[in-house]
Amino acid sequence: MAKIPYAILEKGSLLLASPDTDQGVFARSVILLCEHSLNGSFGLILNKTLGLEISDDIFPVDKVSNNNIRFCMGGPLQANQMMLLHSCSEIPEQTLEICPSVYLGGDLSFLQEIASSEAGPMINLCFGYSGWQAGQLEREFLDGNWFLAPASYEYVFTDSPENLWSMILKDLGGKYASLSTVPENLLLN
């Protein structure tokens, strides 16, 4: 029996850019859909990591003991806004569960506390976000700009975010697996 493609646009879905999407930051991006409603959608890019130097006034990097912190470009909108994706379920009043064991939210004191803990939770510190107006994401999906997959802790906090796009396509199997081998520069094909 053939696998039925995942086709549900909802919180906890992963959006994978079609290989022919050549839209700068969205090229080969994997986006965790954090909210999807009739009013619009927003998500965070998981596979575009950043090498950042952050002011000690904002985040005292010298006190970071948790090696599980990754800096990501969440998207092109409001790039100065910081959002936390993490695996800490202990502060439910400040966070929203996006998929099992993956949470969005928390404040600066929470971040500083878990960053100084050697055995802290997994954290994606995302700068900016990706957003769509009402109906826009649905149109892009129907136009073939995005493929969908269910999100998981393993995908969100993978050790190799640079390979996440092709890893998920391979896991989806079938035609998606063959798309995972398409070169970034289609002229090289």
Curated annotation (Swiss-Prot):
SUPFAM superfamilies for the chain: VC0467-like
Gene Ontology annotations for the cellular component aspect, listed alphabetically: cytosol
Protein family per UniProt: Belongs to the UPF0301 (AlgH) family.
NCBIfam families xrefs: PRK00228.2-3
Protein name in the entry: UPF0301 protein CAB604
Classification lineage: Bacteria, Pseudomonadati, Chlamydiota, Chlamydiia, Chlamydiales
